[in-house]
């Protein structure tokens, strides 16, 4: 009787050990699945962040190139406007010179006309 109780007790302990081992393996498998799922979820976020960073880097390079082109074009426009401004000043200078010459010519013409009229009046008729 004692040996039968001992065998039953050992059998129940073996069943409990097997059940405990089975549950331990299931817990390890579940923990592994959870870990893999978490890693996959984090990897998706990291991959997305990496792709976004690459896109941002590309956009920054494009923006730098366009900003440099804009600066160059702006410099060219400034040069053209300065040249145009200088040309307008020169045209204004020529216009003032022409007015001055015209005024001098009118003065000379008036003086010559005055002298001519004076000579006609003083000439014996």
Curated annotation (Swiss-Prot):
Its EC number is 2.3.1.-. It is an enzyme of class 2 (transferase). It holds the Pfam family GCN5L1. Its main location: mitochondrion. Residues 1-31 form a coiled coil. It catalyses: L-lysyl-[protein] + acetyl-CoA = N(6)-acetyl-L-lysyl-[protein] + CoA + H(+). GO terms for cellular component: axon cytoplasm; BLOC-1 complex; BORC complex; cytoplasmic side of lysosomal membrane; cytosol; early endosome; mitochondrial intermembrane space; mitochondrial matrix. One of its GO terms (biological process) is melanosome organization. One of its GO terms (molecular function) is protein-lysine-acetyltransferase activity. Keywords: Coiled coil, Cytoplasm, Lysosome, Membrane, Mitochondrion, Transferase. The keyword Nucleotidyltransferase does not apply. It is found in: Mitochondrion intermembrane space; Mitochondrion matrix; Cytoplasm, Cytosol; Lysosome membrane. Belongs to the BLOC1S1 family. Component of the biogenesis of lysosome-related organelles complex 1 (BLOC-1) composed of BLOC1S1, BLOC1S2, BLOC1S3, BLOC1S4, BLOC1S5, BLOC1S6, DTNBP1/BLOC1S7 and SNAPIN/BLOC1S8. Octamer composed of one copy each BLOC1S1, BLOC1S2, BLOC1S3, BLOC1S4, BLOC1S5, BLOC1S6, DTNBP1/BLOC1S7 and SNAPIN/BLOC1S8. The BLOC-1 complex associates with the AP-3 protein complex and membrane protein cargos. Interacts with ATP5F1A and NDUFA9; involved in their acetylation on lysine residues. Interacts with KXD1. Component of the BLOC-1 complex, a complex that is required for normal biogenesis of lysosome-related organelles (LRO), such as platelet dense granules and melanosomes. In concert with the AP-3 complex, the BLOC-1 complex is required to target membrane protein cargos into vesicles assembled at cell bodies for delivery into neurites and nerve terminals. The BLOC-1 complex, in association with SNARE proteins, is also proposed to be involved in neurite extension. As part of the BORC complex may play a role in lysosomes movement and localization at the cell periphery. Acts as a protein acetyltransferase. Negatively regulates aerobic respiration through mitochondrial protein lysine-acetylation. May counteract the action of the deacetylase SIRT3 by acetylating and regulating proteins of the mitochondrial respiratory chain including ATP5F1A and NDUFA9. Acts as a regulator of mTORC2 signaling in response to hypotoxic stress by mediating acetylation of RICTOR, thereby protecting RICTOR against ubiquitination and subsequent degradation by the proteasome. This is Biogenesis of lysosome-related organelles complex 1 subunit 1. It comes from Mus musculus.
